[in-house]
Amino acid sequence: MAFQIPRGTQDLLPGETEKWQYVEQVARDLCRRYGYEEIRTPIFEHTELFLRGVGDTTDIVQKEMYTFEDKGGRALTLRPEGTAPVVRAFVEHKLYGSPNQPVKLYYAGPMFRYERPEAGRFRQFVQFGVEAIGSSDPAIDAEVMALAMHIYKALGLKHIRLVINSLGDVDSRRAHREALVRHFSDRIHELCPDCQARLETNPLRILDCKKDRDHELMASAPSILDYLNDESSAYFEKVKQYLTMLDIPFVIDSRLVRGLDYYNHTTFEIMSEAEGFGAAATLCGGGRYNGLVQEIGGPETPGIGFALSIERLLAALEAEGIELPIHRGIDCYVVAVGERAKDETVRLVYELRRAGLRVEQDYLGRKMKAQLKAADRLGASFVAIIGDEELEKQTAAVKHMASGEQTDVPLGELASFLIERTKREE
């Protein structure tokens, strides 16, 4: 029987993994520049965390979670998103008592959702996320959005758009909820079954419906921006002011509510506008979650964050025709001619690697010509040929693959020679 990977997952082979490593490293470096530190949480958590943290009326909880019972009878769930686990760790380890506030964290890792696989959407996918917990300053909202935009710009993306909205505070959302119920009640039967159920449980989520997004009831729905109280409106104005000061263009979409229940005040998405990118145009989403820490058992603590999909980021780079500056070649391929030379190259290759060089050798007993072809396929900058004659002189015949120039180099000086030459070519 030939086994295949489960539906909605993917294997990342050499040549692809380097792209992932590159974009993740760019994101990590920028996070450190902005003062964020890495946190790592388990891949599975107690199911109750997501019921309370994400919201038991959300599609994620109702339809998409991978939940199982362990041998001790505990209900556990593969994490479908990263914010609730990070906030759980923040509360469990009492990071709210840290003298360094706000606590600024980033994470990267696989998430799991039982969704219909399609372009840009997987059942196992990798999120890179940021959380800033402990500040209700609108400036940190702007910083978080600036960091997200900085990551995309640093990778060369040009056709992206920042979309923002405000969901306001508790009072603003309550007034908006009542207006939505009045608006949809008489004609709710025209919408999908999910929307009909949401009218009772969470009317705001009707605006996030993908099936009925073009229905005229959606277009005429009351805008949250008309129900913001003075405090919420002033907060949103300050966020917009900071974004303008940072020269970060944005558009406002009053229907942007996000698919998680913990959001309030600022919500945002970064969209790809690349031609032909398709339906998965949302690259990144985030917002403020001032009640989540308290919901998970901690003190009342504000927070804001975002998560981006690495898969969609790479798809956006491809859509814009951006080639990442990845060098897959090696510094040197050591060619052994004869058994005596083979014994010497085993030791020599190890020494060159210890010196910091990327080095390969033959393990298939190939002739010199075949070894040289292998070196070329691996993108070797140099080959070092060692045969009986070179062993007698304790040298290697070093050939520069690009120019064909060949030089005899003492074995004891080979590492320093290669280091100096490879640095010169960088």
UniProtKB/Swiss-Prot annotation:
CDD domains noted in UniProt: HisRS-like_core, HisRS_anticodon
InterPro entries hit by this protein: aa-tRNA-synth_II, aa-tRNA-synth_II/BPL/LPL, Anticodon-bd, Anticodon-bd_dom_sf, His-tRNA-ligase, HisRS-like_core, HisRS/HisZ, HisRS_anticodon
Keyword Nucleotide-binding: yes
Main location: cytoplasm
Family (UniProt): Belongs to the class-II aminoacyl-tRNA synthetase family.
GO cellular component: cytoplasm
Upper lineage: Bacteria, Bacillati, Bacillota, Bacilli, Bacillales
Organism annotation: Geobacillus thermodenitrificans (strain NG80-2)
Protein name: Histidine--tRNA ligase
Localization (cell): Cytoplasm
Substrates-to-products reaction catalysed: tRNA(His) + L-histidine + ATP = L-histidyl-tRNA(His) + AMP + diphosphate + H(+)
Gene this protein is translated from: hisS
